[in-house]
Amino acid sequence: MSWLIQNRIGNTLLRLNPSSSSIAIFSTFIKNLSTASEQLPETLDEYSQSEEIWNVIVGRDGDRDSEDDVFKRLSSDEICKRVNLSDGLVHKLLHRFRDDWRSALGILKWAESCKGHKHSSDAYDMAVDILGKAKKWDRMKEFVERMRGDKLVTLNTVAKIMRRFAGAGEWEEAVGIFDRLGEFGLEKNTESMNLLLDTLCKEKRVEQARVVLLQLKSHITPNAHTFNIFIHGWCKANRVEEALWTIQEMKGHGFRPCVISYTTIIRCYCQQFEFIKVYEMLSEMEANGSPPNSITYTTIMSSLNAQKEFEEALRVATRMKRSGCKPDSLFYNCLIHTLARAGRLEEAERVFRVEMPELGVSINTSTYNSMIAMYCHHDEEDKAIELLKEMESSNLCNPDVHTYQPLLRSCFKRGDVVEVGKLLKEMVTKHHLSLDESTYTFLIQRLCRANMCEWAYCLFEEMISQDITPRHRTCLLLLEEVKKKNMHESAERIEHIMKTVKLTAPVK
């Protein structure tokens, strides 16, 4: 944990003056939340510098309405003058300000003014992407021309530009960038054509992509991947009939549809709950010499699970085993989850303890997570803890944040906040794990419900410091709770964050 965050949380505790019993509980929450980072001094140093610069830009009064304002702030600040600037630090800063193009450009301008620093192509690519996201097309084009002069434009750059144009509905501009590939020292070939087509299809511009293909295929030969791009594009647009037509077109060009082609269509049928057509497609795959693989069957099972059709999902698993398809860890993780939700705990245990080892299928973190979640869901927390200890002592894999989420949920369910603190401390001090957005959100919401918004607020501060954007609903809940306790400074801070940081939109 950076000294800035430690001081911020420490000052918060002094202002709040909580009870000694609450401090005992909370000390297991926040203390050493970033211990994992402290094992790597160079990472901590870079992180601390990023935090300092962030506070120079956002945490102080004054204008920052333009990149020049940000540049002046950074150039005149004594802390920034002592910063050990690196490509990694610039990347981290640009990532933090990816939704604030003025600050991002101000950072680039300041970095460029620092002695001995020269921007990497990655920094330029990020700037182009940030400007494209903000639809600042003229500024983006300026950067592209600058990159062209320095011969820094790559296919990755082109992909970012085309994606932003296509996403904004400016698909002609995206095609125009492709037409200029020669100016950037890049070649128009099947690879670059597929990049354009894939960009258009992913942005649901599949019809425009079709027009482009018809124009280009006379001098650029499509390959099997070209047709798979369109199959995915049509399915994403929920137009499965066109995807099926593309399968026929693919055959007409001498390419045999592969398991990826069919599985993409099956996934679309699953999303439409057309499971009869799913089974028809499975039969067609077998007849055409492209038998379903483990991913195909797992996709179907996951979709059935989402519909709570657990018994039907188990029948799909049986069909897979009978077909001779070799199962993998992903399939077994899904099978364990299915058995757990169907209430067949003993069968899930047999799969985990007997079937997977016998077939030589590796047990990974997700496998353990499925078993731990199963035990927690069925209120068998002792078995979940035993399995966690087994996982820790094995050489197979290590726990991750998702390992602990069902355990934390169980603790809150029975009102054991002290155990929550112990688990959190174990996560960060023993396994050097960093909390993710979903875990922070879960903890903040549950602490608010438990009338412990002081500690929820401190986790909120830590969340912001880790570059994790809180959800709009989380901010509103926390703001309401701190106002109830007359935590005026905390309320002002939350409101400031809500104004200056682009929050995840509320669920409608």
From Swiss-Prot:
Keywords of the record, alphabetical order, are: Mitochondrion, Repeat, Transit peptide
- PPR repeat segments run 120-150, 154-188, 189-219, 223-257, 258-292, 293-327, 328-363, 364-398, 400-434, 436-470
CC per GO annotation: mitochondrion
Q: Where is the transit peptide?
A: 1-74
- Which NCBIfam families does the entry mention? PPR
The family note in this entry says: Belongs to the PPR family. P subfamily.
Q: What is this protein called?
A: Pentatricopeptide repeat-containing protein At3g04130, mitochondrial
Please report the organism this UniProt entry assigns to the protein.
Answer: Arabidopsis thaliana
